[in-house]
């Protein structure tokens, strides 16, 4: 999309675990002899945004494993594994049931199962306080787990206070979370993969990740659609479009106040509010 320059975040769904060390890099050579086989994969707990430990038991496990689970982020081996047992920990970033597959070093599927994370009784909500009022956003971890976890990481690290809405287009979007009033950019976390095409649409009041032209480039910046923007929806999931991860459930009138502020060109950027609209607080309220 040419009308905006987007910024934004990247998680990896597949973790390669080479033999004898839990490396996340794939092995350059294929081990000889028998490949691994699995008897059991046992998680200790499955709680949204908590760490879970997976204990894998079987045979020849040091020959190399590839574990694939979309909702299990930052897979790390715990301790020193053996040929009959390896233990890994990861952060569960999705809710509901996700598929878990394990492949041997020859790429054969040696285990297929599921991990089910109970849906929280109350969906996550974030309250954003600005110089023009407060906005409550409800997030959708079942539809956009990577984007939601990324956004909450920024919220919990107190990243957003003193950033501004730096792009305001009254018949399009309000975009913020990436610049200070001096139009400097705070240091962000790593970029995330694009979760467009997740079933959530860029309609009025929806909240989505901003990004650069390339798909997997979102970091901290987000935007709120002030009108229905079907042109921002994906035609090729994960390749184009913009990933919606939540919606405004309270304070849409404040969004309308923000979209109406006068703007100008500043620091080489267009559509910057003449008087900064500053995010003064961002906290998880549910």
Description of each model-found segment:
Residues 21-286:
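Cyclophilin-like peptidyl-prolyl cis-trans isomerases
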Residues 1-8:
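Bacterial N-terminal signal peptides that target proteins for export
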Residues 13-14, 83:
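Residue-level signal for mature regions of secreted extracellular proteins and peptides
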């Amino acid at each position: 999309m040419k009308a905006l320059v987007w910024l934004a975040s990247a998680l990896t769904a597949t973790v390669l675990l080479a033999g004898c060390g839990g490396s996340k890099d794939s092995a350059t050579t294929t081990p000889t002899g028998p490949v691994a086989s699995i008897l059991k994969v046992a998680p200790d707990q499955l709680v949204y945004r908590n760490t879970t430990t997976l204990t894998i038991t079987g045979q020849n496990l040091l020959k190399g494993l590839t574990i694939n689970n979309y909702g299990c982020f930052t897979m790390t081996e715990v301790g020193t594994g053996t040929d009959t047992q390896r233990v890994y920990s990861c952060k569960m970033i999705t809710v509901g049931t996700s598929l878990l597959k394990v492949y041997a070093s020859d790429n054969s599927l040696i285990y297929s199962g599921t991990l089910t994370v109970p849906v929280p009784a109350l969906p996550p909500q974030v309250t954003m306080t600005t110089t023009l009022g407060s906005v409550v956003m409800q997030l959708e971890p079942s539809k956009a787990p990577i984007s939601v976890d990324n956004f909450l990481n920024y919220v919990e690290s107190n990243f957003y206070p003193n950033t501004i809405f730096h792009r305001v287009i009254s018949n399009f979007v309000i975009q913020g979370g990436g610049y200070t009033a001096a139009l400097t950019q705070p240091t962000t976390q790593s970029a995330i993969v694009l979760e467009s095409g997740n079933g959530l649409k860029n309609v009025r009041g929806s909240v989505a990740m901003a990004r650069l032209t390339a798909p997997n480039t979102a970091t901290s910046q987000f935007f709120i659609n002030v009108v229905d923007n079907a042109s921002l929806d994906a035609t090729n999931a994960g390749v184009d479009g913009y990933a919606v991860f939540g919606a405004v459930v309270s304070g849409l009138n404040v969004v309308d106040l923000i979209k109406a502020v006068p703007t100008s060109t500043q620091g080489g950027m267009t559509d910057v509010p003449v008087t900064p609209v500053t995010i003064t607080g961002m906290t998880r309220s549910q």
